[in-house]
Amino acid sequence: YDIQPDMVTLAKGLGGGVPIGALLMTEEVALKMPKGGHGTTFGGNPLACAAALAVLEEIEGRNLLQHVSEVGNYFQEQLRSI
């Protein structure tokens, strides 16, 4: 569909069970955001950040995004054949 979001929110899966949330945005949106305008009292918790880093390293190290794409394509093909 060639859709490019301006913002994406992440949560549960990012921390592998440790509570965390994140907001990803384009540079254009980020430049319009006031400094500290999206912060929280709990933002930057070291344990949550370490957990998120470990999850991201696993995703990258195991090439999981490519695998998800391949499995998704296979799943769609199988559904179409029904």
Region locations from a protein language model:
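Conserved N-terminal phosphate-binding loop of PLP-dependent enzymes in the Aspartate aminotransferase
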Residues: Y1-I82
